[in-house]
C-alpha cells in the first residue's frame, strides 16, 4: 500500500490489478485498496445509457474536469475507477497534471497563476454549481476545481488556452484493472467510445487529511461513519463484528443519528427563507 501511495504522490495516478473486495462495500473497499479509512464515499456505476445528458452516463467525448461535489467543504481526494468491461473502441482515460500546470504558470504567466488562486469563479456541474477559486488550499495543499463545461469568463478562457500546451496522459484501463486518480491534483476526461458494453464502477473518497500524507486509522466521523456505512447497505453483522459491538448497539446508533438529523432538518425548514444570519 505504501508503494501505491508513493506512486500517487509521484505521478498523481496509478493503475493496479483490481482487488477482490467488492466496491459495493465502498468504505471497506477503499480501506483495503489504499490502507486508509475514508471520511465519506460515493459509489456510482458508470455505464452508457440511451439519451443520457451527463458525461458519466453518455458515450461522448468528456473534456477535462475534476469531480468537485463537496463533503464538509472539500472535494473528494481520490477518484477510483474499477473496470469490469472496457469499451470495444475508444473510451480511453485522459489525464492532465494540474500541479505541473500551476508550476509552469507561476514561472510563465504569473497573473493567471494568481487569478486561479484568488478569483472566485462559477464552475457549472451536473450536480450543481460551485463558486470558488479554481485552485484552493485544502488541508495544506492545493486542490483544483474545474468544470467540463466551456468557460466564458476571462480567467477560464486563459486557462483553456494554457491547457492546450500541457502534456496529456492517455490510459486504456482494461477489465480487471483499477485506476486511481488524485482528484485534487489531476484533471481527467475521456475519449468518446462506441457501443453500450463499457462498464465501470466509480468510487469517490474523501479523507480527513490529504491521502498521500495520511496514515492508517478509523474514519474521523467515528460512529456516524459506521451508521452511514450501514445505511449504504453494508451488512450490520459485518459492521458489528468489525466494531466489536452488538447489532442492537448499531441500530441504537442509527436511530439516534437519524432522529438528530431529522430534528436538525426540521428546524432548518422552520426558518424563514429570507433568513441570512448564518
Walk through the language-model features, giving the residues of each:
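Residue-centric detector for conserved, function-critical "anchor" positions
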Residues: 212-278
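N-terminal non-catalytic cap/leader segment that marks the start of a structured domain
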Residues: 1-45
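Active-site environment of non-heme Fe oxygenases that use a 2-His-1-carboxylate facial triad
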Residues: 2, 9, 13, 42-213
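Short active-site-adjacent helix-start/loop capping segments
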Residues: 23-25, 71, 248, 260
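Short glycine-rich, polar/acidic loop-and-turn segments at beta strand-coil junctions
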Residues: 19-20, 68, 243
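Solvent-exposed, well-ordered amphipathic alpha-helical segments
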Residues: 1-3, 25-33, 115, 225-229, ...
